[in-house]
Amino acid sequence: MAAGTQFDFGNARLASMSKQPRIGIFVCHCGINIGGVVKVPEVVERVRALPGVVAARDYQYCCSDPGQNIIRETIEKEGLSRVVVACCSPTLHEKTFRKACAAAGINPYMCEVANIREQCSWVTKDRDQATDKAFDIIAMTVARVANSEPLVAAGVPVTKRALVIGAGLAGIQAALDIANAGYETVLVEKEPSIGGHVARLASVFPNFDKAQEMLDAKLREVCGLRRVKLLTGSEVVEVSGQIGNFKVRIRRKPTQAQGSVPDSPDDGGQETEELVGAIVMATGHELMPVSRLRQYGGGQVPDVIDALQFERLLAGNGTVRRPSDGRVPKRVVFVQCAGSRDKEHGVPYCSKVCCMYAAKQAMLYKRRVPDGDAVVCYIDVRTPGKGSEEFYRQATQEGVRYVRGKVSKIFRSGDRCTVWSADTLAGCKVVLEADLVVLAMAMVPNPAGVSLARQLKLQLDANGFLTEAHPKLRPVETLTGGFFLAGTCQGPKDILETTVQASAASAKVLAILGQDELLREPTVACVDEDVCVGCGNCELTCAYSAVTIDPQRRKAVVNVALCEGCGACAVACPSGAMSHKNFSKRSVYEMVDQI
């Protein structure tokens, strides 16, 4: 659940529930954003007649310091017990106004925002219609706040340890950042070794740095840090708890010498339990198997390989040799978007890094085989990022040929491969004879990572990548509190972007671990046990595992530490037992009555 806001209650009247609520309304002009469309003075006069309203004022910018002072002074002067501020979206300034109310002695959750900017003045051109609509929105908010109850955010202690799932480059970077800040980190990797795909690369663009040399420094550091608990050959089995306090069950796969047998048929390895406060998902990606592209000879023609296989051919210092017969290929054709941007045979998205690593591989091949011919068949060359366009131009200057057109078929012809393509710039069909074909296969989510994400009820997009809470404002957070994203588990990206995202995720983790306790928003689901019949609809609907059915009593139970307050359970409940604090059914009915 989202962390609560730190309010200084001061003399806040937590039990400000007098029989006759005293409601104050403050209407903001927001410059001309609201005042230029809505007749604010008219609205102020009309809202004074609403039940329970004892004060109504307008001000140019209520969010300013003078505006907040007016709110505080009016609360004290009129003895207000509830406040409605008619202004912009509550996302922007709800916390601002609630803090002002708390400072004046009102429970902050007795303050509500009526959005008359985004939902009224910005979308309604007619002044009379906008004025009537603004009044209706305020009237509904008054009906809601009249039924509100004083709430207090509860504090939850924080376990000052972190878990990183996946020990590729993203996971290693995140673990190092967290550990170097002074917190113990559990780094879990399902493979026997760490390093991920980067460990399999010959070099990286745009400077041709040796990938292994670059990675070795990270590996030595992470293996040498006492604050990093590295668990290879292990996988996360179960995660329970909530942000600040997760209990993680990890199974370590059994290791046997070749030819040995397990001690028992069900020997699944040793299980351990770790307590952590935050979790970084760095489960990475895989390349789509070449066997899925039968039209390209994938899985049928031995000299049709993917880019990672070609990296291994480039890894040594010797001559490049093709898999089928060990001969030096005199012509290598690189096929771009093999499975990417192809809804029929692969995935609809661009894999983002293929254009750059194909240019790198083509240049490395030309340097190893000076008399060789490197041809890149592409749909579009995409070169985002610093130095990328210059890198592509360097490839053309070093003799790499680019042919714009979609490859339609690849098949074996004698001891060579025949590539059918097109040159859309020249407007003709192209037939290329190649000794070796390298497919830039689509980057797809790691299947094990997808399975784990589904088990943890983390959100996935249509392609199976983990989904961020907001693509612009919360790019490394998930909708489940305490889980953060790093690397290609969230989508295709290069090494630079992966490292940056890993450090961003670790910074979010440190923001949690640096607190002694987390405040939980009290606006959560609640259940009326007298009405609940234990049908379980709420449990099935909850995306955060916050609602369960007590097996003995057959009643719904809400874990307030997990609840995000989304209200899905209240919608799904057929008996009406599930509700939401300060957004009860009674509040909703009375809000509707105001229209």
Regions found by a protein language model. Name each.
Residues M1-I595:
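Residues forming the flavin
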